[in-house]
C-alpha cells in the first residue's frame, strides 16, 4: 500500500486486504470507485482462468474492509474461460454502479488470429447494492479480442471507453464512443499507442484527459 502527502509517496506497512476467494486466490486488476454515500467499492480478478466471476469488497476508510464476496457474473455459461479486469463505473444518472469485464467463451465469436481461449469480448452488469445485479449482457464486440476497458463520462450523453486490442501483434489501446454507458458503442478507433500497452486509467485534469 502507498499513501501520498505533499506530493510525496510513502509505503505503508502490513496487508489490509488479502485475497481469499476464487480458485487461485489472487488479486489482479483492482478497480475502486467511491459512491456519493462515502463508500469505496473494490473489484478484482480472482484467477487467470477457471473462475466465472470476480472479487468484491467495500470500505469507508480504505483501511478496514468488508468480508470478500465472489460475484459469479458468468455462471450462466460454464464454458466461459475467464473473467478478467472488472472495471467499475459510477452511473450518476441512475445512481448505480456498472461493472465491465472481459470474458472468453470459445466458439461464440469470430476467432480472427487468436485461439479460442484468448478471444475476449466485453460484458457488463449493473447494481445498486452488490446484492442484486442486472442480467449479464454483452457490452462490446469490436470484431477482435478486447480486454481492459475503462469508461468515463465527458458530458451528458457523451461517454468514452478506452480499451485494449488484445490481438497479436497489436496489443494496443483504442477508443470507442456512446451516448449512454450501456451503448451502443461506436467502432473502435485506430490505435493511439504503441504495441504492448494495457490496463489504461483515465483521469480528467481540466480541460484535458490523461490516459496512463
Stretches found by the model and what they are:
Residues 1, 5-212:
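Carbohydrate-active catalytic/glycan-binding domains of CAZyme proteins
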Amino acid at each position: 500500500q502507498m499513501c501520498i502527502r505533499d506530493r510525496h509517496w510513502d509505503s505503508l506497512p502490513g496487508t489490509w486486504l488479502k485475497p481469499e476467494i476464487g480458485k487461485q486466490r489472487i488479486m489482479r486488476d483492482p478497480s475502486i470507485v467511491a459512491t456519493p454515500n462515502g463508500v469505496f467499492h473494490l473489484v478484482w480478478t480472482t484467477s487467470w482462468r477457471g473462475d466465472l466471476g470476480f472479487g468484491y469488497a467495500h470500505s469507508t476508510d480504505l483501511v478496514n474492509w468488508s468480508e470478500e464476496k465472489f460475484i459469479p457474473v458468468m455462471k450462466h455459461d460454464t464454458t466461459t474461460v475467464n473473467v478478467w479486469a472488472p472495471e467499475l463505473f459510477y452511473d450518476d444518472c441512475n445512481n448505480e454502479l456498472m461493472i465491465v469485464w472481459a470474458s472468453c467463451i470459445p466458439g461464440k465469436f469470430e476467432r480472427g488470429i487468436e485461439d479460442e481461449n484468448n478471444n475476449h469480448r466485453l460484458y457488463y452488469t449493473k447494481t445498486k447494492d452488490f446484492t442484486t445485479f442486472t442480467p449479464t449482457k454483452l457490452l462490446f464486440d469490436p470484431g477482435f479480442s478486447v480486454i481492459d476497458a475503462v469508461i468515463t463520462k465527458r458530458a451528458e450523453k457523451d461517454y468514452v471507453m478506452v480499451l485494449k486490442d488484445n490481438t497479436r501483434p497489436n496489443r494496443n489501446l483504442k477508443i470507442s464512443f456512446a451516448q449512454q454507458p450501456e451503448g451502443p458503442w461506436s467502432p473502435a478507433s485506430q490505435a493511439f499507442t504503441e504495441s504492448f500497452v494495457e490496463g489504461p486509467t483515465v483521469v480528467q485534469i481540466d480541460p484535458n484527459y490523461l490516459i496512463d
